[in-house]
Amino acid sequence: MPSLARLDYGWVVVAGLCVTETVSWGILYYGFPVMLRPMEAELGFSRVELTGAFSVGMGVAALAALPVGRWIDRHGARALMTLGSCLAVGLLLVWSRVESLPALYAVWCAMGLALAATLYEPAFAAVVGWFATGHRDRALLTVTLAAGFASTIFMPTEAWLVERFGWRTTLLVLATILAVVTIPIHALVLRRPPRGESRAAGVEWVESRVPGLTLGAAARTGVFWVLAVAFFFGNFTTNSVTVHLIPYLSDRGYTPTLAAVMIGWLGAMQVPARLVFAPIAVRFGHRAATAAIFFGQALGLAQLALAARLPTLVPMVVVLGAANGMSTLARATTIAEIFGPRHYGSISGAVALGANGARALAPVGAAFLQVALGGYEPVFWLLTAVLVVAGFGVFAVRTRETHRE
């Protein structure tokens, strides 16, 4: 009977994380762009200066990904994610009182730690150990589908609150929501998979027999570095397009409003795309499905480079948006599939160090390349070529040595 009681608890963890990831992403990640203009108007700092604080936070989150993963492998996700939520709540309260640029940067430097402890990487690590391969993809898909609606739910709500009450009061409201929703769920729902008992998928897994490489062993394989580099450039591409799409298309005769709508639809395409990733991965294998994602990003980026010559950019929006949506899920499931779940947190954190670092580097890096290469088109073509190479690399690299420690 204890086994039966534990049989479905993995799905309780998934349900809790669906709620907390949606709220955490909606407030901690998507909240900053909503606060940007009102902060600019009140504080008097330039948009570049203000967004620099956000980039610093992303950079700190990337650097913290590896130690966060190691902690979860050893101690589980409950304490870390609970403390991360508590830290985030406190920082939102401090942010609401910020008057100077150094104070804002200090808040977001610390916020990077909160992001690393509450967003996808720790959530995925909390889920993976509960499920065998056949159910793991579905569990991770469920979390990413729910969190995919974070911007849809929170950005309009935050904009309405800012318009009605101002950005400082809005941050107080968001801090309250984050505290009331995420802290209790992280503290009370999350737990480590049971040792020596059947897991949520109904498979007998004794802890000592859980398959998987250590981080050190994984780092000695070629596939680890291929994945790390590939996901770095995939994330770099996604965030470069998000930041630079409006100025690029505006220079080519598109209205800023239409360009903004395209960004919105790029995000909207991510949710349905995630639904089809699992069947594709089952049919063709995780590596083939992941390689196809990089080819899809390359195809979408090539269409974007030809924007001035194409009658419509709808195919670009569909292909690039779908590929971007699958990428987050692919990173989580492919790492677990290739390296095993035993040290998933450490390995995922190491890959995330580059992938999330790309999120911080992309806005500035793409701008630098645009100047150095003389325009956006050469940048897009360069990234297209890199993504094609990444796709072939993921598909071709050998994995016979993995998943056996």
Where in the sequence are the language-model features?
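Extracytoplasmic
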Residues: 12-47, 65, 155, 241-246, ...
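Hydrophobic core of transmembrane alpha-helices in multi-pass small-molecule transporters
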Residues: 22, 91, 102-118, 144, ...
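Extracytoplasmic gate region of multi-pass secondary transporters
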Residues: 29-37, 216-272, 362
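Intracellular juxtamembrane helix-capping segments at the cytosolic ends
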Residues: 39, 117-131, 326-339
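Conserved MFS/SLC helix-loop-helix module at the cytosolic interface between two early adjacent transmembrane helices
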Residues: 63-101
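Helix-to-loop junctions at the C-terminal end of transmembrane segments
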Residues: 64-76, 273-285, 370-371
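Structural signature of the two symmetry-related core transmembrane helices
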Residues: 79-93, 288-303
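Helix-loop-helix hairpin linking two adjacent transmembrane segments in secondary transporters
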Residues: 143-193
